[in-house]
Amino acid sequence: MFASPFLEGDRVMLMPLQPSDGLWLQPIWNDPETTKWMVAGRTPMAREEMDQLIASWRSPSAFVFGLSPVKERATRVGYAGLFAVDWIDRKAEFRIMVSAKTHGIGIGRQATSLMLRFAFSRLNLNRVWLGTAATNDRALACFAKCGFREEGRLLKDLWRDGSYIDNVRMAILQAEFKGA
C-alpha cells in the first residue's frame, strides 16, 4: 500500500519515502543509463545498502520523496530531495534521479518545480543549489527552465567516459523563484 501524495502536479506526484522503498529504488539506482551523469549510482548498491541509505535520508536536514507519474500512481520512477538543509543560513542542496525509462516527458522538470515551491514556500529557505555534470545537457536545460542559474564550475571534477569533466554548480534564490 502506497502513501498519499505529499505534493502533486499534473504529471508527477511526490510521495513520502517508506522504509521498504529500496525495493523500487535499487533497480533505478543501479541502472547505468539512469545514472550516467550522476555521482549516485556509479557503483552498484545492494538492497541492504539501499535500505540504509533511505533510512539515513529520514532526518531533520533532508526531505526526500519518491516520484510517481500521476497516471501510474503505484509506480515509482525516481526520487527528488533537499539535502544538507541548513536551518541557520536557510539553504539546501537539491538532488533528483529520474529513471531513464521516463526521460523526456516532463517528470523531472515538474518534480524540480514542486520541490522548489516546497523549499521556498513551506520551509522558507533562501537558497537551493545543485551540482551536475557539464555534459548533462538535458539536466542543465531542465534546471535553467526552473530558474536555476550557473554560479560556477568545479573544473575537471568528475570522471566520465575516459576523461574528466566539469561539475556545474547552479542555484536559485527564493526571491528569484517564480513557480516555473
Named regions from a protein language model:
Residues 34-35, 63, 125:
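A general structural signal for well-ordered secondary-structure junctions
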Residues 54-66:
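A short helix-loop-beta-strand connector motif used in the catalytic cores of GNAT acetyltransferases and
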Residues 31-34, 59:
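Short helix-loop boundary/capping segments at the starts of domains
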Residues 41-42, 66, 159:
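Sparse recognition of residues in long alpha-helices and their boundaries
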Residues 1-22, 27-31, 71-180:
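Acyl-donor (CoA/ACP) binding surface of acyl/acetyltransferases
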Residues 33-54:
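Conserved GNAT-fold acetyl-CoA-binding loop/helix
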